[in-house]
């Protein structure tokens, strides 16, 4: 079975549409390979991360931005004082792709020591 390290080691593939989104069963199987806390709903995956303070929250946001730039796959993020909600979907196909799970795994790896 693939695990978070396997997903995090993969590279996102360019996606410009014309590819069907993942089926629900495929998305559920990939979701099991991520850290707990990720939720699947409305053709997207999301997770809320909590921190001690604003500085730690913003450091996390900047780290996610770096991952996004490296993979050329960008999440929606909602940022508060000590929380950040990260949501992935692949807009070009109107649903989830493997890229969303690859990036989610890379985000999880930011917090694993």
Curated annotation (Swiss-Prot):
GO terms under biological process: tetrahydrobiopterin biosynthetic process
UniProt catalytic activity: (4aS,6R)-4a-hydroxy-L-erythro-5,6,7,8-tetrahydrobiopterin = (6R)-L-erythro-6,7-dihydrobiopterin + H2O
Catalytic activity, EC: 4.2.1.96
Enzyme class: lyase
Residues passing through the membrane, by range: none
CDD domains with a match to the protein in the record: PCD_DCoH_subfamily_a (cd00913)
A single GO molecular function term of this UniProt record: 4-alpha-hydroxytetrahydrobiopterin dehydratase activity
Keywords for this protein: Lyase
Family of the protein in this entry: Belongs to the pterin-4-alpha-carbinolamine dehydratase family.
The name this protein goes by in its record: Putative pterin-4-alpha-carbinolamine dehydratase
Organism from which the protein derives: Nitrosomonas eutropha (strain DSM 101675 / C91 / Nm57)
Origin organism lineage: Bacteria, Pseudomonadati, Pseudomonadota, Betaproteobacteria, Nitrosomonadales
